[in-house]
């Protein structure tokens, strides 16, 4: 790729931060808002689903989802997301980022609404249709990962590229927060309109029939922000790097970016030979890719896999951890609406105090500190705080020490988000060639979701008490919350070691990082 071909890409690399950058952040970021909202809102309503559809009047405890149903409801969207990341990642390189970007959003809108309209009033029918639609919701969400990251990286200038991609990803924190606020608002409204006694006072009346609408409204709300951004996604031009380096149309790329940057970019004559240079046409499964990027791909996949085991197991099962330490009262002392409110309040406080600030610390410092140092430090601090919670676990569960537990637990989330949860999303969008960028990001993200599935399914069983008398209905004894947290700490430490396989992209152009600029040096 000679210097002439780089004209339009250089213009993007050195462009001052301007309106189109922020427009791209909002368009891609609102997709991530929806992604996070849809994936995490289910953790707010699983206990409510148990009360409604698995009520047993003979039991001293409210109904709860059977183990296989809980695992399916929590994990099916993650399975869909993994599939979507691989499929749309590949498709984004084959057809272009823009062509498939709108399709992912349409899937999210339709499946969010359909999830809330899950058919029937019997447990089997509702759970089956809910899981079906949440799988396809996850499939659409999965496509948003590689496409949003790739589009933002290819639009950004090299000076603030990390902050722009991080800002898109930071909308995940806002989505988690929004899920909490929506649940708080909806449960408060229903509590005032349809007051009910606690389960201990009246088992049947503690779950009035109207609460069936609570979880449906919460789940369906995720469609709204996605719908608001669809028009603007369709108006975005294809990225210049895809048009020039993959579609081989430098003229169109120059015209598109001249409009976006609102400046004239000169079109050089010697372009075709550079763009079509055979040295840059190696495939994903070639020896050349293995030589250049094999360790990089191992680094991005392994770190994302290990991070998501810890991150998703903690996020999806916050309610179980908070119940175990007594931060959420025993279920029998609440009615169905109160339980939703208390779980949402706990999750919202964690998001507000640690999750959201962690994301925006990454936005603020990633282009000064660098991706590598932030990720390494994040894994290290997560390990420290996880062990600090786990080893003296019996100390933290005492009533007088619960605030300390919440502080320590919050700090693990802060350093996850001011750390590997953000950087594992950013780096794969920067270090691979344009024609494989979306695919490699999709592979890396899918490895992360594989870790999330391990966390979602594994933690559900592992965190059960070792005492058979204390396990949840239908579960075998596990290793307990304490030992589960120790295991997560060990995984965080291993993630820190694999970070050394990932290069530092700070301040470099995408072509310099991917090796696509090497041809120009050979030709000069």
Swiss-Prot record:
It is found in: Cell membrane. Ubiquitinated by NLA. Ubiquitination of PHT1-1 leads to its degradation by the proteasome. The keyword Membrane applies. The chain crosses the membrane at residues 25-45, 71-91, 100-120, 132-152, 162-182, 212-232, 293-313, 349-369, 372-392, 403-423, 442-462, 485-505. Its main location: membrane. It holds the Pfam family Sugar_tr. Residues 46-70, 121-131, 183-211, 314-348, 393-402, 463-484 are extracellular. InterPro entries: MFS_dom, MFS_sugar_transport-like, MFS_trans_sf, Phos_permease. Induction: In roots by phosphate starvation. Repressed by auxin, cytokinins, and the Pi analog phosphite (Phi). Interacts with NLA. NCBIfam families: 2A0109. Belongs to the major facilitator superfamily. Phosphate:H(+) symporter (TC 2.A.1.9) family. This is Inorganic phosphate transporter 1-1. It comes from Arabidopsis thaliana.
């Amino acid at each position: 790729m000679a210097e002439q071909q780089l004209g339009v890409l250089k213009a993007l690399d050195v462009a001052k931060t301007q309106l189109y950058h922020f427009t791209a952040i909002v368009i891609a970021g609102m997709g991530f808002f929806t992604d996070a909202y849809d994936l995490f809102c289910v953790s707010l309503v699983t206990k409510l689903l148990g009360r409604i559809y698995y009520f047993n009047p003979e039991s001293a405890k409210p109904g709860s989802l059977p183990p296989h149903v809980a695992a399916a409801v929590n994990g099916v969207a993650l399975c869909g997301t993994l599939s979507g990341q691989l499929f749309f990642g590949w498709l984004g390189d084959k057809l272009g980022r823009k062509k498939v970007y709108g399709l992912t959003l349409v899937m999210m809108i339709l499946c969010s609404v359909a999830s809330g309209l899950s058919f029937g009033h019997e447990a089997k029918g509702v759970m089956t249709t809910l899981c079906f639609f949440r799988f396809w919701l996850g499939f659409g969400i999965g496509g948003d990962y590689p496409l949003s990251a790739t589009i933002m990286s290819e639009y950004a200038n090299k000076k603030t590229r990390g902050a722009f991609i991080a800002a898109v990803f930071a909308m995940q924190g806002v989505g988690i927060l929004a899920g909490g606020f929506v649940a708080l608002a909806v449960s408060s409204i229903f509590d005032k309109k349809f007051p009910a006694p606690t389960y201990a006072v009246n088992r049947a009346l503690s779950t009035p029939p109207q609460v069936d609408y609570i979880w449906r409204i919460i789940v369906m709300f995720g469609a709204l922000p996605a719908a608001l951004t669809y028009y603007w996604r369709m108006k975005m031009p294809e990225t210049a790097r895809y048009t020039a380096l993959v579609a081989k149309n430098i003229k169109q790329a120059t015209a598109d970016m001249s409009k976006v940057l609102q400046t004239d970019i000169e079109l050089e004559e010697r372009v075709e030979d550079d763009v079509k240079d055979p040295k840059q046409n190696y495939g994903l499964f070639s020896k050349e890719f293995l030589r250049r990027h094999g360790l990089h791909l191992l680094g991005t996949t392994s770190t994302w896999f290990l991070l998501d085991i810890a991150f998703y197991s903690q996020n999806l099962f916050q309610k179980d951890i908070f119940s175990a330490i007594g931060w959420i009262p025993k279920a029998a002392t609440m009615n169905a609406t109160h339980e939703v409110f208390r779980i949402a309040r706990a999750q919202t406080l964690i998001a507000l105090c640690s999750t959201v600030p962690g994301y925006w610390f990454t936005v603020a410092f990633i282009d000064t500190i660098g991706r590598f140092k932030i990720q390494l430090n994040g894994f290290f601090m997560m390990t420290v705080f996880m062990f600090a919670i786990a080893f003296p676990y019996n100390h933290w569960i005492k009533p007088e020490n619960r605030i300390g537990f919440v502080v320590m637990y919050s700090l693990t989330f802060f350093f996850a988000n001011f750390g590997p949860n953000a950087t594992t999303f950013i780096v794969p969008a920067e270090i691979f060639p344009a024609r494989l960028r979306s695919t490699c990001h999709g592979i890396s993200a899918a490895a992360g979701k594989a870790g999330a599935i391990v966390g979602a399914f594994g933690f559900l069983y592992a965190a059960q008490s070792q005492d058979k008398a204390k396990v949840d209905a239908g579960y075998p004894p596990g290793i307990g919350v304490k030992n589960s947290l120790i295991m997560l700490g060990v995984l965080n430490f291993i993630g820190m070691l694999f970070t050394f396989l990932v290069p530092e992209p700070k301040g470099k152009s995408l072509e310099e990082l991917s090796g696509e600029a090497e041809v120009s040096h050979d030709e000069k």
